[in-house]
Regions:
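Positively charged n-region of N-terminal signal peptides that target proteins for export
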Residues: 1-5
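Hydrophobic h-region of N-terminal signal peptides that target proteins for export
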Residues: 6, 10-19
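Non-catalytic cap/lid and distal C-terminal segments of serine-dependent acyl enzymes
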Residues: 21-299, 320, 324-325, 339-344, ...
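Beta-strand-rich binding-surface signature
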Residues: 22, 303, 333
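Secondary-structure transition/turn motif
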Residues: 115-116, 348-352, 391-395
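A short, amphipathic beta-strand motif
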Residues: 302-310
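Aromatic-rich carbohydrate-binding modules that target alpha-glucans
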Residues: 309-353, 361-381
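Compositionally biased low-complexity segments at domain edges in trafficked proteins
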Residues: 312, 384-400
């Protein structure tokens, strides 16, 4: 089965590539009730987004996107530096949202304002009088109450989210996990874990990671700050990181479906570690999805209606997928009803997320779908349970 899924994915990419919509980036200015200034946002949609109208995409939120390099690196690395799911079930396409931190001299608002809270332990270090801090709760509210609803309303999203940050924005991303559970998954590159008398490290040490029952991915990394540049970054930086990384490495703190990954890149300095670290993180994340999300079945059950459309359909069309009602990935899973010579349909009650594919009774004769991205077809939530898939007219079935 695995080999056939890979062949299908490759065939779909080749056959659809000539007609697929190019990837695009939209620049957006958003008013916010939490800020006196507009927030600048970048939204990337992958190749084929408009064509693949039956695909709902996970969303990656990238902070510090005012440094356009960081935002662009994420979608570029996914396309050229990440290994695909070896079983072909997990797609490689994401919607990516870049959140820019401003430099506003007229109101003395800067990047650190976005990523630091008000101090609990006095005005020292990053919290000295005249420094910039205190608005991280407002940024969380903006993301949760304004940006995420905007993205969900205007784009086809799965509901699953990943937050990525570097340095102070990495600290912010980790803080979002322990204070707001803002994202499902987290990538933190060279986080500052020592500010405000190790506030973040202390909070992570006290956080009940096992309270989350659904799959989760947590990645954190450090560059040469603690091994080769301690005189610049200080003993506190090293101590904070060691406390956080110790927790993340200890699997006893987590449920089995939580995957943690901790890396160090001592050959790279603080800023330049972003590329190798995010490359490693995204590869780990794809594998996490392949192993932990493809096999995950939630408790929610919903009625679904699924159609497969094409010309002169045969009467031996099957749907198969990740649960008993879908045949548990047996090639000859559940036979669909031939409504007409152009429509096969089926109504089921499925656990969500439901993942499935179409065959003619064997993996050598798997359907090639024109209006969905590669990987398994997925129904993520009860709001989008009617799906209509179209066979590729030129070559609708593998092996025919």
């Amino acid at each position: 089965m695995n080999k056939k899924i890979i062949i299908t994915a490759l065939l779909a990419l080749v056959s659809l590539g000539a007609n697929a919509q190019l990837e695009s980036v939209k620049e957006l200015s958003m008013k916010s009730e939490y800020f006196s200034h507009e927030r600048q946002v970048l939204i990337y949609t992958p190749v084929g987004y408009k064509q693949f109208d039956q695909t709902y995409y996970d969303v990656i939120y990238v902070f510090d996107a005012q440094d356009r390099t960081m935002f662009d690196l994420v979608h570029c690395l996914l396309n050229i530096a990440c290994k695909p799911d070896p079983d072909g079930g997990r797609g490689m396409s994401f919607i990516i949202v870049g959140i820019c931190s401003p430099t506003l001299w007229d109101i003395n608002y800067f990047r650190n304002n976005d990523y630091l809270p008000m101090p609990l332990h006095g005005n020292k270090g990053l919290f000295k009088e005249g420094y910039y801090y205190g608005n991280s709760p407002d940024l969380k509210k903006f993301v949760k109450n304004e940006l995420m609803p905007y993205v969900a309303k205007n784009y086809r999203t799965s509901g699953r989210t990943l937050g990525i940050g570097h340095s102070l924005s990495a600290s912010f991303v980790l803080d979002c996990m322990i204070t707001d559970d803002l994202f499902d998954d987290y990538i933190a590159v060279s986080p500052n874990c020592s500010y405000d008398e190790y506030r973040l490290a202390t909070d992570i040490e006290g956080y009940q990671f096992k309270s989350r029952k659904t799959p989760r991915f947590i990645y954190a990394s450090m560059a040469r700050e603690i091994e080769k540049e301690p005189e610049y970054w200080g003993d506190e930086w090293k101590a904070g990181w060691e406390r956080v990384s110790t927790i993340l490495k200890d699997k006893s703190h987590f449920n089995e479906n939580t995957v943690t990954s901790v890396h160090t890149f001592p050959e790279y300095e603080h800023y330049r570690s972003f590329m190798p670290s995010v490359t490693a993180a995204l590869n780990d994340y794809i594998m996490f999805g392949a192993k932990n999300l493809v096999g995950y079945i939630g408790e929610e059950i919903s009625p679904v209606h699924i159609e497969l459309r094409g010309k002169n359909l045969p009467n031996d069309i099957y749907i198969t997928g990740n649960q008993e009602a879908l045949g548990n990935w047996e090639a000859e899973g559940v036979k669909m009803n031939l409504v007409s010579d152009s429509i096969a349909a089926i109504d089921l009650r499925l656990h969500l997320p439901a993942q499935f594919k179409f065959t003619r009774g064997s993996w050598e004769r798997e359907a090639v779908i024109e209006n969905a991205d590669t990987g398994n077809h997925i129904i993520h939530d009860a709001e989008h349970t009617t799906r209509i898939y179209r066979l590729w007219e030129r070559n609708p079935w593998l092996g025919e």
